[in-house]
């Protein structure tokens, strides 16, 4: 084989490998990027919901007040949304509210009333005036099926009266991550050749 042809093929091999590795970096960055965006949205929503829950929490009617009724109504809605070709039919947030000891006083799914959440990072840190969040497996030990929890303080003026944790399954964004990764791979394959 002639030297010129070898150099030509070597150059394209190096460029192709470089493009492949750059493409892999992009693909691997999609998942954490989407999860960071989801966390940011959960922070906003948790803080809005914490403000909305404060009046009922302060009045001692967090289990049967307006906040809970409004949440129940929202969970019953048929959303009928299509987001980037993926259907969104229902609200998939889970909301828990704990008292100052970290004991669950409200759970939108009704599963964990009375449970001590004071050692979970989202509640623990928020009770100490810090930002609290965690991602935990749905089934202990199963790291493939996790839920992101973001907490916000429930306040009466400046006084902390509880912690609202907003949880969303990471699986709810998996279709978007997979679609983005496929798109990057497809475009990268076209670019490489």
What is the predicted role of each segment?
Residues 65-82, 92, 103-145:
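Extracytoplasmic/periplasmic sensor domains and loops in membrane signaling proteins
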Residues 25-53, 177-183:
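Juxtamembrane membrane-water interface segments immediately C-terminal to a transmembrane helix
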Residues 143-153:
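A short beta-strand signature within small-molecule sensing/ligand-binding domains used
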Residues 107-111, 165-170:
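Short beta->alpha transition motifs characteristic of CBS
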Residues 140, 155-157, 166-185:
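Helix-start (N-cap) segments at beta->loop->alpha junctions
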Residues 1-26, 189-193:
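Extreme N-terminal signal-anchor transmembrane helix of membrane signaling/transducer proteins, especially
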């Amino acid at each position: 084989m002639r030297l010129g042809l070898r150099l030509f093929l070597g150059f394209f091999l190096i460029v192709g490998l470089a493009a492949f590795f750059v493409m892999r970096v992009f693909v691997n960055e999609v998942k954490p990027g989407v999860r960071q965006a989801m966390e940011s949205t959960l922070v906003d929503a948790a803080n809005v919901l914490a403000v909305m829950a404060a009046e009922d929490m302060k009045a001692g009617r967090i289990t049967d007040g307006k906040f809970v009724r409004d949440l129940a109504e929202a969970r019953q809605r048929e959303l009928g949304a299509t987001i980037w070709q993926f259907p969104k039919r229902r609200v998939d947030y889970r909301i828990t509210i704990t008292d100052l000891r970290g004991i669950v006083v409200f759970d939108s799914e009704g599963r964990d009333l009375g449970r001590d959440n004071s050692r979970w990072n989202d509640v623990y840190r928020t009770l100490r005036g810090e930002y609290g969040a965690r991602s935990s497996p749905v089934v202990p030990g199963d790291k493939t099926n996790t839920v992101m929890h973001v907490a916000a303080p429930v306040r009466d003026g400046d006084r902390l009266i509880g912690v609202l944790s907003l949880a969303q399954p990471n699986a709810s964004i998996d279709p978007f991550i997979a679609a983005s990764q496929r798109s990057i791979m497809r475009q990268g394959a076209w670019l490489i050749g």
